[in-house]
A protein has these predicted regions:
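Short helix-to-loop capping/linker segments positioned immediately adjacent to catalytic or ligand/cofactor-binding
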Residues: 119-123, 142-152, 170-174
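Short amphipathic alpha-helical elements of helix-turn-helix/winged-helix folds
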Residues: 162-166
């Protein structure tokens, strides 16, 4: 009899192996032995700032926000994670403690791999190293774009960019074209680098003007 948890682990390893392909059967067995799957309720932390990064994570189900606190006591959402995206590994490769925090935006399931195990596989399999090199490069490019948008665009432009980012990453519901991610007004303001009151007012203006998200 195969336990449900074992089945989930095998399915996750299979999905990860497809992204890192080609992997040998021995490498897949290493991942299967190392993987740990954990469920998180909405608003629960996956990791906190100043924690020691010892595990690499991939989101299996749900949505997660990565954010950082500023000097003014306001949080800034760096990005939102969707299923089958990796996170929580940059600090390890930079030999740093976590500078950000990760919290579940809704009930979520996360798979964990020990970073030492992944690094060992990276040394043995060039395709895994190349995957993360491309992954980090893509994130860096997106971060550059976000920096320009948040520092040079006006309030309406910043909020519009945030809404388009969410739609492109998470999609929208077919019946009414609403976003397939539910953010609080505070989180949307944080993603757009503005106060909550400005976000509410700008959203109201968008609604009154009957504006729609289209990428």
């Amino acid at each position: 009899m195969v336990l449900k948890r074992d089945y989930e682990k095998k399915e996750v390893v299979k999905a990860v192996a497809e992204m890192w392909a080609p992997l040998t059967q021995a490498e897949k067995r290493v991942l299967l032995q190392d993987i740990h799957i954990k469920s998180f309720k909405k608003n629960h932390f996956i990791y906190k700032s100043s924690d020691l990064p010892t595990r690499m994570m991939v989101l299996i189900q749900g949505k997660i926000k990565i954010y950082k606190w500023g000097r003014n006591g306001r949080s800034q959402i760096i990005r939102a994670i969707k299923p089958m995206e990796f996170f929580g590994f940059r600090a390890y490769f930079a030999n740093e403690l976590y500078k950000t925090e990760a919290m579940a935006l809704e009930n979520a399931v996360v798979a964990f791999f020990n970073t030492d195990t992944i690094v060992k596989l990276m040394k043995e399999n060039f395709h895994i190293s190349l995957f993360f090199l491309r992954y980090l490069s893509k994130e860096l490019g997106q971060s550059d774009d976000r920096t320009v948008n948040l520092t040079q665009k006006h309030i309406r432009g910043r909020l519009a960019e945030a809404l388009l980012l969410l739609k492109n990453n998470f999609g929208s519901e077919e019946e009414d074209d609403t976003l397939s991610i539910h953010l609080s007004r505070e989180d949307l303001a944080s993603l757009s680098n503005m106060t909550t009151s400005n976000a509410i007012r700008t959203l109201s203006n968008f609604a009154n003007e009957n504006l729609r998200c289209s990428s």
